[in-house]
C-alpha cells in the first residue's frame, strides 16, 4: 500500500510526477519549466488554501529558481529538499532519479519558510564562519533540511526558520566542528 500525502506536491515535470505517484498516493502540480507563469502560481495558491502545498523541485539552479518564485508568491508552503547526490544519474539531476527512501526522507523533513523577524544577525552569521566556509554551511543546511545553498540564501532561510546563533552552535558542536 502506498503512503498517502495530503498536500499537493509541486514538481517541475511529468517525470517527477510519475516517479512520486509510483511510490506514493499523491497529487501534483507541474510547473513545466523554470518560467513559472501566473496561471500556475494561481493554481498553487488555491491548492495551498485547500490542501496545503509541498514544493519539491530538482536540486539544481532552475529548481531553486522555481522554488524562490513560488515561495515569494504563495506564503507558508512546505519545502522538501533532496541532496543532489541522491537525485542524479551520471548525466542528469532531478527528483525523478531518486530512490523511494530518499524521496520519503525529504518529504518527512519538509520545512516552511515564513516572513521573518531577524533571529540571526549578519555579524553572527559571519562570526559562525558560514560565509566563507561551504563545509560548515553545508553541515547546517543538511541538519536543518534546507538544501545546500550559498551564504546569502542560507542566511535568509535560517532567519525564515527563526534559527538563532545558539541553535547553530549546538548543531556544529554535535558535528564536532568547533
Stretches with model-predicted labels:
Residues 1-12, 17-25:
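Glycine-rich, flexible N-terminal cofactor/catalytic loop recognition
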Residues 2, 22-27, 34, 38-178:
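TOPRIM fold recognition
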